[in-house]
């Protein structure tokens, strides 16, 4: 009998290892959070199983700290639309134990995400006129609904909500970085101004909600971006705004299965999600969240309808939008000009908010509508890349 029990125990242990969740690697050269990991549970994990798993992880972590090993344990928990997971700081033995739980889908290192922006000299805001005129022009033509009733979640470096561009339509939502409700880089304020500013914005009546996930250097961990998406979905659901919301992420980093997975769930929940393609002049399939096929991935165009030299390209790109020398709001008042796919993505978010208000279409169907309205005018867009440029359908 003893021999039988020994064999059974060994068999169960072998089965556990065989069924262990994959611990994903990050691309070479990616900047990672030391000992930081993201854990994603399988879709069929119940709330009770998830709770039990977290209690078990806490117990493991408690034993680790009792042994004098460093580790912070679980920091953020994600639980929405059957997406359950968490992130934290763990030693390698703990991560190995976690990956052996059959309820875990995968584990991946927590990597650093960065904003996609360059600061350039001041110039006129040509992007607005370009997206409302088939053949160019200097006037911005739009319907008076102008995004009224639509909420825009700016998952970024924060927003100067008191800037006159927002006319009281901007609020702080969540700060996942620090205790400073401010924009340390100017990036998020510029992005928000393009989406819904009174002068520089497309959807001039939309509401801006600041979700701070990037620090004063324009960086943040993947786990923090996921937490920002999680918060945005829950907030929109609580206020009955899921299908009348857009979420913009002008940021990106190395490929992340976890970030792509959670971003896709935001769209499945009913939101429109625009993301920047990246500024490395490479295939955007290598980046996240740009490589997630269900999002609207936006590359950057120039004033003469060319591909911006820095813009990423590839089959993951859905549209081009103005991204070179874009004038918009800056913290503290006034304006500044920036370039990058970070500037292209909010043009798409703004037109998305505009169309949701004007045509009444739900957020998760807007990317298709944007592609239907777009025009094939981009010259030399890149290998296996669309030539279609964002257009608001004004008829001009």
Swiss-Prot record:
It is found in: Secreted. The active site is at residues 156, 187, 342. Residues 125-396 form the Peptidase S8 domain. Residues 37-114 form the Inhibitor I9 domain. Residues 21-116 form a propeptide. Its EC number is 3.4.21.-. Gene3D superfamilies: Peptidase S8 propeptide/proteinase inhibitor I9, Peptidase S8/S53 domain. The keyword Signal applies. Glycans are attached at residues 230, 248, 392. It comes from the Eukaryota. This is Subtilisin-like protease 5.
